Amino acid sequence: MALERTFSIIKPDATRRNLTGKINAKFEEAGLRIVAQKRIHMTKAQAGVFYAVHAERPFYDELCEFMASAPVVVQVLEGEGAIAKNREVMGATNPADAAPGTIRAEFAESVGENSVHGSDAPETAAEEIAYFFSGMELVG
């Protein structure tokens, strides 16, 4: 398996409850290194651009409002098979379907407030990383 990078967001429901450290520990326990991280307050406009792929979906406006409702932590994670590993550690989108021990099983409040976002493919990871980080901010 190749060394790769993926993008992650610790969402407002998790930052409100001060879960950043616990979530980061899950990533690190899975062998993922945090090579860039910053806490930001995303604007609704930033969320709208970031989640543009969902613009036609009924939950889009609510998602953008939620993502702008409190600070988030944007991150770049690195490791062997980082994209798949991160998705495994996060668990299913619906916390009711998430495997025990995953981030969403332990911390998510609902399908909408599910604590974390993670890239689903190398192409989206590259786009999402570039949206929030410059190359100089990625320290491997």
UniProtKB/Swiss-Prot annotation:
Catalysed reactions listed for this entry: a 2'-deoxyribonucleoside 5'-diphosphate + ATP = a 2'-deoxyribonucleoside 5'-triphosphate + ADP; a ribonucleoside 5'-diphosphate + ATP = a ribonucleoside 5'-triphosphate + ADP
Cofactor: Mg(2+)
One of the record's GO cellular component terms: cytoplasm
GO molecular function annotations of the record: ATP binding; metal ion binding; nucleoside diphosphate kinase activity
UniProt-annotated binding residues for ATP: K11, F59, R87, T93, R104, N114
Subunit and partners: Homotetramer.
Function description: Major role in the synthesis of nucleoside triphosphates other than ATP. The ATP gamma phosphate is transferred to the NDP beta phosphate via a ping-pong mechanism, using a phosphorylated active-site intermediate.
Protein family according to the UniProt entry: Belongs to the NDK family.
Listed name of the protein: Nucleoside diphosphate kinase
The organism of origin for this protein: Roseobacter denitrificans (strain ATCC 33942 / OCh 114)
